[in-house]
A protein has these predicted regions:
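N-terminal leader/targeting and accessory segments in enzymes
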Residues: 1-88
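Phosphate-binding loop of NTP-binding sites
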Residues: 10, 86-151
Length: 151
């Protein structure tokens, strides 16, 4: 995807980047960065994403989004909120799937897993459509069951 399409709504206007640069993926974990990907340096609770910008660039990241200027050289764009920028580029990358979905959130202290599993089952039986579930224990996408990661 061309960087101008990927960064729409994420990078401040006038940010210096090659609008025709081809980006081949998005990563926010420097350990998984592949050549040509966009690396989003998220501020962390225990460790800070900007500490890993050099590692991401050494692995071939094409561009970095970060909240403060990194040390050293490399192609980067400063954004006011890296998490919001990640949300925007992810939506662009995947074609804004939330615009086609009904999203229901369940919050609370107890009973979230039970409530979401029951809700998924009811919705599928009533509508005849498949429902997805992103939960603490697992993620369900149609009939696919995936282990939950970073919950």
């Amino acid at each position: 995807m061309r960087s101008r399409q990927l960064l729409a709504g994420a990078a401040p206007s006038g940010a210096p980047f090659d609008p025709d640069m081809e980006i081949y993926g998005i990563s926010y974990d420097s350990r998984t960065v592949r050549p040509g990907e966009l690396f989003v340096a998220l501020p962390g609770w225990r460790t800070d994403g900007p500490r890993y910008i050099r590692e991401a660039l050494d692995k071939g990241a094409a561009l970095v989004l970060c909240e403060r200027p990194p040390e050293g050289e490399g192609p980067w764009i400063r954004v006011p909120d890296a998490r919001a920028a990640l949300a925007a580029v992810s939506a662009n990358w995947f074609g804004h799937p939330a615009e086609e979905l009904t999203v229901i959130g369940v919050t609370g202290t107890n009973g979230k897993t039970t409530t979401t599993c029951l809700l998924k089952e009811v919705l599928e039986r009533v509508t005849g459509e498949k429902a997805g579930l992103i939960g603490t224990n697992q993620d369900l996408i149609g009939d696919m069951v995936l282990p939950a990661v970073r919950t």
